[in-house]
Amino acid sequence: MSRIFAHTAMLDFAVARSAMTGLNMDRLGGSVASFDNLYLPRLHRAGYVAPNASTDHTASPGGFVLDSQPGIYDHVLVLDFKSLYPSIIRTFCIDPLGLALGGDESLSQDATVPGFLEARFAREGHILPELIRQLWDQRDAAKGASDEPLSQAIKIIMNSFYGVLGSPGCRFFDARLASSITRRGHQILGRTRDYIEAAGHRVIYGDTDSVFVWIHEAGDSEEAHQAGRELERALNKWWRDELAREFQLDSVLELEFETHYQRFLMPTVRGSDKGSKKRYAGVVSRGGEDRLVFKGLENVRTDWTRLARDFQLELYRRVFMDEPFEDYVRQVTAALRAGERDADLVYRKRLRRRLDDYQRNVPPHVQAARLCEQRGLPVPRRGSWVEYVITTAGAEPAQAPLAPLDYEQYVERQLQPVADGI
């Protein structure tokens, strides 16, 4: 355990975050309390008193996800807005005090910045944008000093501010605050897509703070990288010019060319021809070596069997490398039905509640856990991992199944969904 703590610098991170927020290390998850400890002293020094907890529970929209275009592509770039929500707060002067001041009818329109849901934020006298600027500078200094625990602590604190302002448990909660962040993010992502496509490229996906761009005219990796660098430079300049022209604001939005996928797969939604969301795979080159990257797919999910994860890894590798894959699919299916892959058919899932608390729609891992006692096995408790297999009689403990394994269920639920994605 001590080696894990040393390798991950968890204690250094906890100490750094505790020192910055004023919370004890056993309360580091308290984002609202962290925000209060950072914001309230500044509010009081400005001569204002904080309100009680809000009774407004109006929901605000989440991150914007662009429809994906399923298919296999060469040369896909990921352009990512660095700390998008903190950048929006800084750029557009979004702040609880600024919102209150912006509602003063004596202020001219030029003295405020428009938000959403009829919000207006004062250009002067706000607190949160300056607090984020200070944290941003501290993070840059921590990065320069190679202080990763401090840098990570600051990043988490900054990124928590949107969630706090969107939480009814926050005394400053106001739907206009959170919506002015997320809806501005929607607008930024949409206009970024429009700019890229007007430049002759194609955006095949986007999610919250990132856009995925197909550089279809690139002949090799160098041309794709050059296009990524040019898009980064041009878009950052365009956003500076647009916000200065439209709002008379100094933009701190920063778009970065983050990743180049030499080959990229956007799968379809199961049973549909529509593109999926938050699920994709691709090949990146690092240090001269090609590496497969999976996001949201079966290969990175612990609740899928080793059979499915191994199958997906090799199947996608063959597809990306233009190698034959049809015979491979048949071979794996035949080996499964012949009982040659039994060791790879174990599901693993954690119990989130006590066994007695599951009454309706009892999931398979709970069914297997309830069989443990009668088969002389330790009974899993809440928080324990349950290993089970699917047999012709249903879910059974992996350590002591009685019925034969249901191979057809594994074909339909583990192999077929992976293959259908391609």
What do the predicted segments below correspond to?
Residues 11, 15-101, 107-112, 146-157, ...:
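DNA-dependent DNA polymerase catalytic subunits
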Residues 91-143:
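Short, exposed interaction patches on small structured surface elements
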Residues 164-183:
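Gly-rich Lys/Arg/Thr-decorated short loops/hinges at beta-loop-alpha junctions or inter-strand turns
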Residues 70, 140-141, 176-178:
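A short, structure-level motif marking secondary-structure boundaries and short turns
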Residues 123-170:
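Active-site cores of enzymes that catalyze phosphoryl transfer or operate on phosphate-rich substrates
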